[in-house]
Amino acid sequence: MAAQGYEVRVFNLIDPSQSDGYNPFSYIHSEKDVLTLIDNLIKNTTPRNASSNDPFWEKAEIALDSALMLYPVSEAPPEEQNFEMLIYMMNFAEVREEDDQYRSPLDMLFRALEEEQPNHVAVKQYKAFKQAAGKTAKSILVSAAVRLATFNIPQYARMTMVDEMDFGSLGEKKKAIFCVIPVDDSSMNYLVGMLYTQCFQALYRRADEKHNGRLPVPVRVIQDEWANVAQPESYPKILATCRSYNIGLNIIVQNIQQIKALYEKEWESIIGNCDTLLFLGGGNEPTSLEFIVKLLGKETIATRTRGQTKGRSGSSSTNFQQTGRDLMTIDEVRKLDTHKAILFIRGEDPVLDKKYNIKRHPNIKLTTDGKAKPYIHKPQGAPDYACLLYT
């Protein structure tokens, strides 16, 4: 791609030494952006099946995290606006259960800010957190620290210190961003979830502010492993509106159940907002098979039967009958030839066609499948940052 004039960026959670920098703080333009980012962080680091009968804990943690994020955004220089600084600030937080009058260094920092700017939103959020009693506040601190533990790991802290992504420029020039995530460990995938959220926000903002609501260069978002990375809270709305911004989304899932698991009430809307659906076959998941059969519709079969009676009073009769049947049965869909696929395009009849043989692509020679050497990405950032990544 680089040879074709593309600017290539990589966010690599498997090998941070081959990753460009992504700093979520670089995309914060308002208090609302902070709350959106924190909400995304909380949701992406909370187990899917976890439930809490008391929303107080989550709200209190959101108040603390947003206060810690809002402070450097408004009071610190750009080079200190990152998660490493947030962790540094959190290290000065302390709660003593037996002494309600104790003031930690972090308490004094926000007290000083309050004296200068009593209506500062960071002060308000921190005071909301401090309403918790000693033992409760300590539990909230522990929960927040555990949630942000990733940034205690030097290589991950470094890759989020500076930003080299510039998401908005995706819609203005030839540029590609690759997200590399572990197959066997999803604990870090929330970072990609944050990246998705801010990428869409940046593209929409760039389109509205500079290009009258439509990006000059089409942006295609290919979301492989879609089900393993938490999507933005407003994903169904993004899917419904992105086309007008010249953005296209490709959702890749193993089966329909993966969509239903994430969006139980909106899964049909998500599929309905996709103009094209490509079924590659395979799998025995009943919901997906039934869905494809229903989507294919029915065909009409004309039947002609003829009867004849021999003898002195012989007679004959012909009967025509039309019956309907599924275009393909569940069993036929399940046994679909592995070399074929079913394509659904809005407003058109379904198409059963052969899959393209990727080995025949003229650029296959540039991939490892075509015997080429694996691509090793060299971070494009400042030399000192690149050196830090390799220490």
Descriptions of predicted regions:
Residues M1-I247, L262, G272, T323, ...:
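P-loop NTPase motor domains
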Residues L239-I342:
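Conserved ATP-driven motor cores of ASCE-family P-loop NTPases powering translocation/secretion/packaging/pilus
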